[in-house]
Amino acid sequence: MRVVLQRVSRARVLVDGQVVGEVSGEGLVAFVGVTPGDGAGEVALLARKIAELRVLRDERSVLDAGAGVLVVSQFTLYADTRKGRRPTWSAAAPRPVAEPVVDALVEALRERGVVVATGVFGADMAVELTNDGPVTILLEA
């Protein structure tokens, strides 16, 4: 499981021009990629990291700050570009496998007290964000 975490001063995701998820003020955007072998162990580890990582201003976590996390599924995090000019995504989990894992991550974050907004799994989304810092961190489990 792979998460690209970005510290933001604002973020939102739109589907068909409609806002479906938003973080107002400081927070994090978590772009999440899943492989077929990912499960409860990876979800628990990454939920803890996302919730407790002290990457907001003044060395605070989203829990410390009461900040939100916008979770966006992104299978392209597992692009394989080693051959040719067109990436393949064979390492990414198919939707029936990946969607419940992303849902479990969202639920695990909420159980930790994190305010979570989401995109729509599998939708063509427009993600608008203002990266703060910039701070971008790759988490893997």
Swiss-Prot record:
EC number: 3.1.1.96
Protein name as annotated: D-aminoacyl-tRNA deacylase
Keyword list, A-Z: Cytoplasm, Hydrolase, RNA-binding, tRNA-binding
Motif Gly-cisPro motif, important for rejection of L-amino acids, residue numbers: 133-134
Enzyme class: hydrolase
Gene: dtd
GO biological process: D-amino acid catabolic process
GO cellular-component term (any): cytoplasm
Subunit structure: Homodimer.
Function, in words: An aminoacyl-tRNA editing enzyme that deacylates mischarged D-aminoacyl-tRNAs. Also deacylates mischarged glycyl-tRNA(Ala), protecting cells against glycine mischarging by AlaRS. Acts via tRNA-based rather than protein-based catalysis; rejects L-amino acids rather than detecting D-amino acids in the active site. By recycling D-aminoacyl-tRNA to D-amino acids and free tRNA molecules, this enzyme counteracts the toxicity associated with the formation of D-aminoacyl-tRNA entities in vivo and helps enforce protein L-homochirality.
Protein family membership: Belongs to the DTD family.
Database matches in Gene3D superfamilies: D-tyrosyl-tRNA(Tyr) deacylase
Domain remarks: A Gly-cisPro motif from one monomer fits into the active site of the other monomer to allow specific chiral rejection of L-amino acids.
Catalytic activity: glycyl-tRNA(Ala) + H2O = tRNA(Ala) + glycine + H(+); a D-aminoacyl-tRNA + H2O = a tRNA + a D-alpha-amino acid + H(+)
